[in-house]
């Protein structure tokens, strides 16, 4: 299984990337490989600059990136089960079952969460739209979750019990997304 993650800037440590070696072959798209295990395949930056770091995830859909079966994981996820159950050929993301729909606003909140994604056929159209409309996208959209959902790109969603948000689940999920204030 090929795991893919993104590490830009100093927010997250190399140890968070290295922990994924326990689960499969690891690829890391990063601007700083210091401290990463030699067993991790480093993907060099494409040269795009984003004020909002989350947008570096969209570079993963560039035609220049490897077109292989990947399971993408944010660095701060907790893993409790068999990651193979999350592998999908079509672009798949979690639906945020744990969020109240009353939290949604037109632009800033979404029912998607890109903390976990899987694909074989990467959604190049998402990357191309961003590159061709960069000023609009980076001005208008506060993150990639609402951008992907509101722009109506094609995606599938995981079944509810597979991915949960910390403290929101009754049955232990395979992946647990952590609260922002606990990400280190």
Q: Which stretches of residues belong to each language-model region?
A:
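Short amphipathic alpha-helix with an adjacent loop that forms part of the alpha/beta core around
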Residues: 62-64, 86
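Glycine-rich, basic loop-to-helix element that forms the pyrophosphate-binding segment
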Residues: 53-60
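Catalytic core and acceptor-binding pocket of nucleotide-sugar-dependent glycosyltransferases
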Residues: 116-184
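Short, polar loop motifs at secondary-structure junctions
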Residues: 27-36, 75-83, 163-166
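A conserved catalytic-core signature of glycosyltransferases
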Residues: 56, 112-114, 143
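N-terminal anchoring/stem segment of glycosyltransferases
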Residues: 1-52, 65-66, 121
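Conserved donor-nucleotide/metal-binding helix-loop-beta segment in metal-dependent transferases, i.e.
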Residues: 78-111
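Short aromatic/hydrophobic "clamp" motif used to bind/position activated sugar donors
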Residues: 70
């Amino acid at each position: 299984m090929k795991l893919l993650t993104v590490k830009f800037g100093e927010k997250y440590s190399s140890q968070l990337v290295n922990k994924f070696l326990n689960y499969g072959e690891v690829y890391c798209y990063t601007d700083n490989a210091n401290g990463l295990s030699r067993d991790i395949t480093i993907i060099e930056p494409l040269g795009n600059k984003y004020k909002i770091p989350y947008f570096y995830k969209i570079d993963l859909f560039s035609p220049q990136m490897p077109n292989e079966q990947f399971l993408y994981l944010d660095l701060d996820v907790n893993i409790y089960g068999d990651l193979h159950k999350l592998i999908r050929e079509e672009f798949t993301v979690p639906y945020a079952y744990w969020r109240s729909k009353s939290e949604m606003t037109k632009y800033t909140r979404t029912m998607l969460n890109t903390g976990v994604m899987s694909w074989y056929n990467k959604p190049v159209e998402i990357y191309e739209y961003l590159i061709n409309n960069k000023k609009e996208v980076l001005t208008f959209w506060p993150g990639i979750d609402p951008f992907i959902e509101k722009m109506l790109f094609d995606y599938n969603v995981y079944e509810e019990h597979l991915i949960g948000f910390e403290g929101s689940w009754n049955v232990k999920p395979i992946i647990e997304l952590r609260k922002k204030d606990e990400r280190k």
